[in-house]
């Protein structure tokens, strides 16, 4: 907890092509070494691939994938009387979004397709349909929280 004032959240500019703030955030998550133009090319390429493969609106598929990958609960370590307990806690909305984006990116990087835009397109389509690496990660986190439900009275 900061001892001084609370730092205000920065206003995120929506992306130029679709006018979506979430897409702009995702661009920043995908970006490596400050190369935003490369991240932009990857994401727009992936969205084009999504429209080709599914025939649906790419932004809708992206938003569905994002909402499907968001975790509801996660576990945090809490030390009580010399023992560490994994305590399930609810994830706040901003962290939900950040985790979902990170998991989508990581799952896309682990896929086998040739280029990153194809990998990302495949992962977003899979996540929108409720499968894929990001969904596996979310389910794993939910399972951990479910298994440690007995320690939920140690809330922070």
From Swiss-Prot:
It holds the Pfam family Ribosomal_S7. It comes from the Bacteria. One of its GO terms (cellular component) is small ribosomal subunit. One of its GO terms (biological process) is translation. CDD domains: uS7_Bacteria. Keywords: Ribonucleoprotein, Ribosomal protein, RNA-binding, rRNA-binding, tRNA-binding. GO terms for molecular function: rRNA binding; structural constituent of ribosome; tRNA binding. One of the primary rRNA binding proteins, it binds directly to 16S rRNA where it nucleates assembly of the head domain of the 30S subunit. Is located at the subunit interface close to the decoding center, probably blocks exit of the E-site tRNA. PANTHER family: RIBOSOMAL PROTEIN S7. Part of the 30S ribosomal subunit. Contacts proteins S9 and S11. HAMAP family: Ribosomal_uS7_B. Belongs to the universal ribosomal protein uS7 family. This is Small ribosomal subunit protein uS7. It comes from Chromobacterium violaceum (strain ATCC 12472 / DSM 30191 / JCM 1249 / CCUG 213 / NBRC 12614 / NCIMB 9131 / NCTC 9757 / MK). The gene is rpsG.
């Amino acid at each position: 907890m900061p001892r001084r004032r609370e730092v205000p959240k920065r206003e995120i500019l929506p992306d130029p092509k679709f006018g979506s703030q979430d897409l702009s955030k995702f661009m920043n998550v995908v970006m490596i070494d400050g190369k935003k133009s490369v991240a932009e090319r990857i994401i727009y390429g992936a969205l084009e691939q999504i429209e080709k493969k599914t025939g649906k609106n790419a932004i809708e598929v992206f938003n569905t994938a994002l909402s499907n990958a968001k975790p509801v609960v996660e576990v945090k370590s809490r030390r009580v009387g010399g023992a560490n307990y994994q305590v399930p806690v609810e994830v706040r909305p901003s962290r939900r979004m950040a985790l979902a984006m990170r998991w989508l990116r990581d799952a896309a990087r682990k896929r086998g397709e040739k280029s990153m835009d194809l990998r990302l397109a495949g992962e977003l389509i899979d996540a929108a349909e409720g499968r894929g690496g990001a969904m596996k990660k979310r389910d794993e986190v939910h399972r951990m929280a479910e298994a440690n439900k007995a320690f939920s009275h140690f809330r922070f």
